[in-house]
Structures are given as structure tokens and as C-alpha cells.
């Protein structure tokens, strides 16, 4: 007799196991499943578990050569999504042995691989992952983390201030360096290469690195504060990326930058290891994230990309503003900000957190608020993000009517006023505008900024919202 029975079996016979008790070593995933009509919920959840682990569409004789019970993913719970017709959250447990140690690339290749093109599903979204502590311990994580960064910069008790140099493309290296100098001289802690500044004909990377290093050393000498410029090391190959990071280290600058989604997780982890070994901080930009995370029914939520970044490595990552021009609902944003910074985060569905996550002392990542923010937003940003954040004003610095340095002064005065008011027990959410007005009496730069941006609003509802 034949040792196995050929043919197509329902996935739920093997992969839907509601009685399964999850293990501390399992990777747990919460998928939002939108099926084709007529497919029962158990079959959908089981199909996701199968296609992202050991299953294929038909029975194969080589199944008998391994222990599927040991290696298969299991759909262990399904719940309907409130307010949505025929949409479910499927919870899947993956055994740890399915994944290579220390590889975000391998983890994502399994969990968000071919299954997202599966015909039986109209749409599929990965809402959250629970990374087991045993797997976290195979990663280095952020090169330095929040406390080490503060110690390196000697800056405590307040958020850090940044600015993206604009126009993002087209400046020569010397003019670019001049813009950096003006911002840092005015009181900012950091300036930033835009994510698409790499090494183009109008400004090659080596020239930019040299002029920016000159600018930050000059600003440091004048202000007595440590300054940084995020030198974007992102390149077409890993070798070229590391070459740029090496040159940044030789210049003695404190921080480099990487576009982690367009650059890829393998490149990002490589750079993070180099940065820890060589004392460089690593700023991460999330260009391309909205392609993956903006649609509510398909793709992957940013909280998963944020967890992946903390594993792969980065000291800063862009994380939305709540109040500016880019997508981000308050409760959702605060949920993944906690996932970036804190050591232990409780399950809290009201903030989109599906699983309790223990980071077992993996260093934290500083969230960066950037995109359409200006001095009037300062009280809200200080209240929402607290001290461990970088508040990044591009147009909100460079758009000042008197120039870059006065724009930087306006932001620094507004920030110091908000921190002082908070420390005195004032409510920034209620008294924010009053605090800024009071400060502007003593700072003509801030008064001018207040006048320019007093009418600016980005009143659009977020696309990706919490379920009711």
C-alpha cells in the first residue's frame, strides 16, 4: 500500500488547532484576514498558517520524512472584526525552529512571504507579532540605545531637535553644508540628509560628508554643544554603504543614517553591527513604509515594521507626528512608540497592541516626529512624545522668514519654554498656545515664526484607524 494518500486536503484538518496551548518560544502573529466569499473562517486561518510555514497546496510524500507537528504553524484562535462584514483576526503560532537566528530577513520571508499573494484571500494584513525572548536574544538590536545616546551627546531632560535640509535635492555640497551650519548654530541638536539624498550628480556623497562635518564642528565650537548631522550612508550595494560609514567614522562625526526598507533588512543589520563596533549612532528613515502599511486591509502594520527595526538595529526611527502632515492616529502612534522605547509592553487593544511584548533589555529606539510640524505644534509634541524623542522641523525651521538660524532659534526657544512649563506642572494640552505666546514676547525669532504659521492646518482623517 502507498505510504501516503495523494490529493488535496482542507488546510483546517492539519493547521487549525483551537486547543493548542502557545509556548513561550513561539512567534505569535495576528493577521487581519479578508477571504474570498464562501470560505469558512477556520479554513482561512488554517490556510494562512500553512502557507506561511510548512504547507503547500497538495499532499506530498516528503511530508513523511519530517515531523510536521514539530514544524508547522498553527492557527489557534479566530475572532471576527467588529464593524466589518466577513473579516477576521486569525492568530497563528510559529515554532521557533522555523527561523534563522538573528535574521529579520528570514523571519519576514516566512511570515509575510508568498501567503500574501494567496488566491483564497482577497486581502491579508499582519497586525502584530509577539517575538519570544529566546529569539530576541539572538539579535544585537540598536547599536547604542536611548541612554547611551544621551550620554554621548550630553543632552538630558528634554526632547532633541532636528531639521531636514531642504530643498531635498539639487543643492551643491557647499551650499548644503552652509544650510547645516546655520541650523546647528541656531540651537538645533541635529540636521538630516533627506532620505533620497545618496550620491547624485549635483552632490556626491564624499563632498557632502566633508562639508557637513566642517559645518557641525564649526557650530560645536561656537555653541559649546555637541552637534550631529545624519549622513545618509544608504547606497546601491552593502559594500558601498559600509565604505560611506567608514568615511563618516574617520571624520569623527557622531551619527549616520540608513533607509531601512528600501535598503533592506540584511543591509540594515550589517550597518547596525558596524555602528556599534565603531561608536556611531544610527538614524533610520522609513521611506516606503506607507506602501506596506497604509491600507487597513492589506500589508503589514507599522508596529510590526517598528519591532523588526528594533531587532535589526537603529537608534532613531521616524514614527509619525500625530499632529503634522503625515499619517498617524494618536493611540496607534503611542502604541508603537512604546514598543520602540520601553522594555516591557502590556497587551492593549485600545492602542492596537495585540500581544504583551518583553524586550529583555534590548536597547530602545528614539522615535522621530517629522513631517509638517512647526512651533505651534511644540506643546502637543512635547506632551505626546515626552523627553525621549527627536522633534524634526524641516520646513518649520528653513521656512522662517529670516532664515535658517532664526528658524532654529524659534524652535529651541519654543521647546525650552514647553519643557519649563511642563516641569512647573502646567498642562501643555490646555495652555500650549499661551505658553508659546508668552515665550514669543522675549524672542523676536519665535514671534516671527508664530506669525508665519498661525493658520497652517493639515485637517485630514487618518486612513488606518483602530477597530471600534
Curated annotation (Swiss-Prot):
**Which keywords appear in this protein's UniProt record, sorted alphabetically?**
Calvin cycle, Carbon dioxide fixation, Chloroplast, Disulfide bond, Lyase, Magnesium, Metal-binding, Methylation, Monooxygenase, Oxidoreductase, Photorespiration, Photosynthesis, Plastid
Keyword check for NADP, yes or no: no
Q: How is it modified after translation?
A: The disulfide bond which can form in the large chain dimeric partners within the hexadecamer appears to be associated with oxidative stress and protein turnover.
Q: List required co-factors.
A: Mg(2+)
Q: Which residues does this entry mark as bearing N6-carboxylysine?
A: 192
The GO biological-process annotations, alphabetized, read as: photorespiration; reductive pentose-phosphate cycle
This enzyme catalyses: 2 (2R)-3-phosphoglycerate + 2 H(+) = D-ribulose 1,5-bisphosphate + CO2 + H2O; D-ribulose 1,5-bisphosphate + O2 = 2-phosphoglycolate + (2R)-3-phosphoglycerate + 2 H(+)
Q: What SUPFAM superfamilies does this protein's entry cite? A: RuBisCo, C-terminal domain (SSF51649), RuBisCO, large subunit, small (N-terminal) domain (SSF54966)
What are its GO cellular component terms? Answer: chloroplast
Q: Which residues form the active site?
A: 166, 285
- Location of N6,N6,N6-trimethyllysine modifications: 5
* Protein EC: 4.1.1.39
Q: What does this protein do?
A: RuBisCO catalyzes two reactions: the carboxylation of D-ribulose 1,5-bisphosphate, the primary event in carbon dioxide fixation, as well as the oxidative fragmentation of the pentose substrate in the photorespiration process. Both reactions occur simultaneously and in competition at the same active site.
Give the record's family classification.
Answer: Belongs to the RuBisCO large chain family. Type I subfamily.
Q: How does the annotation summarize its subunit structure?
A: Heterohexadecamer of 8 large chains and 8 small chains; disulfide-linked. The disulfide link is formed within the large subunit homodimers.
- Please state what the protein is called: Ribulose bisphosphate carboxylase large chain
What organism does this protein naturally occur in?
A: Catesbaea spinosa
Amino acid at each position: 500500500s502507498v505510504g501516503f494518500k495523494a490529493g488535496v486536503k482542507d488546510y483546517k484538518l492539519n493547521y487549525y488547532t483551537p486547543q493548542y496551548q502557545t509556548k513561550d518560544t513561539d512567534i505569535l502573529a495576528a493577521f487581519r484576514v479578508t477571504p474570498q466569499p464562501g470560505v469558512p473562517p477556520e479554513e482561512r486561518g488554517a490556510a494562512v498558517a500553512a502557507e506561511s510555514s510548512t504547507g503547500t497546496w497538495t499532499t506530498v510524500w516528503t511530508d513523511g520524512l519530517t515531523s510536521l507537528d514539530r514544524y508547522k504553524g498553527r492557527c489557534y484562535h479566530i475572532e471576527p472584526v467588529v464593524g466589518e462584514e466577513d473579516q477576521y483576526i486569525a492568530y497563528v503560532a510559529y515554532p521557533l525552529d522555523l527561523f534563522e537566528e538573528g535574521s529579520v530577513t528570514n523571519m519576514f520571508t516566512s511570515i509575510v512571504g508568498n501567503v500574501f499573494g494567496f488566491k483564497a484571500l482577497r486581502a491579508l494584513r499582519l497586525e502584530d507579532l509577539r517575538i519570544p525572548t529566546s529569539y530576541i536574544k539572538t539579535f544585537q538590536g540598536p547599536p547604542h540605545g536611548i541612554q547611551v545616546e544621551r550620554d554621548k551627546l550630553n543632552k538630558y531632560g528634554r526632547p532633541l531637535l532636528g531639521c531636514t535640509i531642504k530643498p531635498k535635492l539639487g543643492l551643491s555640497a557647499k551650499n548644503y553644508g552652509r544650510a547645516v551650519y546655520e541650523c546647528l548654530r541656531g540651537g538645533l541638536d541635529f540636521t538630516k540628509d533627506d532620505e533620497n539624498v545618496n550620491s547624485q550628480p549635483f552632490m556626491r556623497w564624499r563632498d557632502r560628508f566633508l562639508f557637513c562635518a566642517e559645518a557641525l564642528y564649526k557650530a560645536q565650537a561656537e555653541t559649546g554643544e555637541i552637534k550631529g548631522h545624519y549622513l545618509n550612508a544608504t547606497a546601491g550595494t552593502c559594500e558601498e554603504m559600509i565604505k560611506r560609514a567608514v568615511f563618516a567614522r574617520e571624520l569623527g562625526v557622531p551619527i549616520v543614517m540608513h533607509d531601512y526598507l528600501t535598503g533592506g533588512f540584511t543591509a540594515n543589520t550589517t550597518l547596525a553591527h558596524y555602528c556599534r563596533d565603531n561608536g556611531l549612532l544610527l538614524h533610520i528613515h522609513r521611506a516606503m513604509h506607507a506602501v506596506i502599511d497604509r491600507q487597513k486591509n492589506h500589508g503589514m502594520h507599522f508596529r510590526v515594521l517598528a519591532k523588526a527595526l528594533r531587532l535589526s538595529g537603529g537608534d532613531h526611527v521616524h514614527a509619525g507626528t500625530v499632529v503634522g502632515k503625515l499619517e498617524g492616529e494618536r493611540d496607534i502612534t503611542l502604541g508603537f512608540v512604546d514598543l520602540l522605547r520601553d522594555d516591557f509592553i502590556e497587551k492593549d487593544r485600545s492602542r492596537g497592541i495585540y500581544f504583551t511584548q518583553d524586550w529583555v533589555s534590548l536597547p530602545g529606539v528614539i522615535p522621530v516626529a517629522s513631517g509638517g510640524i512647526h512651533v505651534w505644534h511644540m506643546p502637543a509634541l512635547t506632551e505626546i512624545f515626552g523627553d525621549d524623542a527627536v522633534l524634526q522641523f524641516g520646513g518649520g525651521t528653513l521656512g522662517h522668514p529670516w532664515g535658517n538660524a532664526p528658524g532654529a532659534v524659534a524652535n529651541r526657544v519654543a521647546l525650552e519654554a514647553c519643557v519649563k512649563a511642563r516641569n512647573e506642572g502646567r498642562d501643555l494640552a490646555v495652555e500650549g498656545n499661551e505658553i508659546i505666546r508668552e515665550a514669543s514676547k522675549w524672542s523676536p525669532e519665535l514671534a516671527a515664526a508664530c506669525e508665519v504659521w498661525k493658520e497652517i492646518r493639515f485637517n485630514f482623517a487618518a486612513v488606518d484607524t483602530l477597530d471600534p
